[in-house]
Amino acid sequence: THKNLNYKAFSKDGFLNDLASCKAVMATAGFTLMTESFYLRKPYLALPMRGQFEQEINGFLLARLKYGVNIRRPTSEAIGHFLYRIPDFAENLKGYKAQGNAAIKKRLSELLVDNGALARDFHTKRMRLIP
């Protein structure tokens, strides 16, 4: 422990408990942690890894949805701005609806009927569109 920071050894269960009990998350902009945070209604400060297109997009969409902020450098001003706005982001996250996998499971079931004939047909048509 140093001032208001607690350093902990790796622990999957400990991490999940910390994520569930925290007020907000500050991390890179990877999809998995961001969506887990949204599901738990945790405001998010994203620090996208430079050159990682997925993370750049995730950070952009995070800010657009108003679930948190997307920053390049963790300055005290940027972090302070995020901390001040946690109640606003938490309010916005109340409207977050987890989509689950039902739609993709339904579509996969449709495509795999008749030993995958529909999936092969879909793939063949799609390949014709690619030059």
PLM features: what roles do these ranges have?
Residues 16, 59, 105-109:
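Short amphipathic alpha-helical segments and helix-helix/interface helices
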Residues 34, 38-92:
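Catalytic binding pocket for nucleotide-activated donors in carbohydrate/polymer assembly enzymes
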Residues 2-38:
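Donor nucleotide-activated moiety binding/catalytic core segment of transferases
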Residues 10, 29-32, 74-78, 99:
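Short beta->alpha linker loops
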Residues 14-17, 78, 103:
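An acidic, carboxylate-rich microenvironment
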Residues 80-131:
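C-terminal amphipathic helix plus adjacent low-complexity
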